[in-house]
Amino acid sequence: MRKLFVFLLFLILLYSCNNINSSQGGSSSRSTISGAGATFPYPYYNIIFRDFMQANAGYTVNYGAIGSGGGIRSLRDHSVDFGASDAFLNQKEIESMNAEVIHIATCMGGIVMAYTLEGIDSLRLTGELISDIYLGKIDKWNDRKIAAINPNIDLPDLEITPVYRSDGSGTTFNFSEYLSIVSKEWNDNMGIGKSLKWPAGIAAKGNPGVAGIVQQTEGSLGYIGSEYALTLRLPTAKLKNRAGNYVDATLETISAAANVELPNDMRATITDSDGPNAYPLSLFTWILVY
């Protein structure tokens, strides 16, 4: 699968680079391919781009993990050959581009709720509780609503420190989309977006920034790509899905969420899928090219 993706990536990026050079009157060959965007798939892209360069010695891929919003702006400004985003372009963004943009779904993954609580390595949360925490309505770990779904855990009388993204983020877009689905109050007051005005918590840049703050801060809670939690060995909460089951973000539960038919333009969401084993905070991520 990885070899196939590397080959497809070569064709996609070479086509993109040749189109850009042709439109600018340049050479049709190019040794450096530049991209920028989402931090969520960055660990995966690191491996893929490494394999791509090993298989194609004449090419170098430079990728800046600056967030989905930055990747979209960079593609619009023609400062990169490809952008990367965890949120597909909306109609306004499509209309702002200089040419037709192709969405290539490269991988799927899960956004996890990582936390740091000494002595607690198992926790359950619901979308409604996460919404209340980030709205500032629940501010203690031993709040009765959290305790009610974690009856066998001795939750501390400790303030919750929610951590969120400071940059334009596709991870934030998917996180806020999920909360807008499960919480009317969130939908009415916060809505969906790559960048939001947060009422409580600590801001950090990129998935690595949020993961780092969570790792260093007792009582913290943050939304990050599952690979970042795995790398830092951060515990993550089981989330209640639409079917009422508490599930972890695993290959099986994310795949269950992705059991959907993709439209022709590849723009699809798998947030809060209704499968009994589906992980509710699952997503596709895309490479964007002209």
Q: Which stretches of residues belong to each language-model region?
A:
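Bacterial N-terminal signal peptides
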Residues: V6-S16
